Amino acid sequence: PPSHYPYSEEMLSLCDREGIVVIAETPAVGIGEGGKDPYRWAPADYHAQVLTDMIARDKNHPCIVLWSLGNEPNTDAHPQSAYDYWHPLYLLAHQLDPQNRPVTLVGCQNDYTRDITIPSMDVVCINRYYGWYNLSGDLEAAAFAMRMEMDYWATVNKPTILSEYGADTIAGMHGTEMFTEEFQVDYYKTINACLDERPFVVGETPWNFADFGTQQGPMRAGGNRKGLFTRDRKPKMAAHYFRQRWENFKK
């Protein structure tokens, strides 16, 4: 997925060496949430400075293929205000990068047809959890919702990446219901089938590589368990599924 924050220089150098592509992202998460028009108080000048610093430091890393302005902003409640905030940052990113890499903003809003900001980016990146947070456990309904949304994004005529999707999975728990390893595989097979039907979808980035700790809460069973690997890097069934899937892409 997009990085959610600028990676360390050491990590970017490792990605350069190993051929791992990176979507470099400013640490701007959830901008535009709350209030009648929250973009009136959004920190545009500071955001521009952070973007400037990130591109100045990291522009020479060949692993970076895409700049992301931020993650999961509210871009549909006040569409014009959102566009007025994000579009100058989009132009700034193109101005700053001598290689003129494409620029994106990762969207997550449910009323995507009202959004005028995400469609204006060079690449459409969307985070979607049909079958998990929405339509929980109902993979047939999740597939229908995913196909309906992808039909909409096809009209935008931009390369599209499903930049987050996943299901919490407790390693060693088996069955057909949510939180089992089997459900995680079925979930990914269901959503990936929707993506494979659409040639404008150019990428998929499962959330997440490995389980990680979070604050306690009723939605977290000992942290975020959406990893393809456990916290100590042991593969779940989904890791083997994706290895086979991606190896077949090479053919």
For the regions a language model picked out, list residue spans one by one.
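Short, well-ordered beta-to-alpha junction loops that form the rim of enzyme active sites
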Residues: 107-108, 164-166, 208-209
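Aromatic-rich peripheral "rim/lid" segments of glycoside hydrolase catalytic domains that contact
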Residues: 198, 202, 207-251
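Active-site mouth of glycoside hydrolases
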Residues: 1-135, 143-159, 169-174, 178-182, ...
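A short, acidic, amphipathic alpha-helical segment used as a generic capping/interface helix at domain edges
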Residues: 188-193
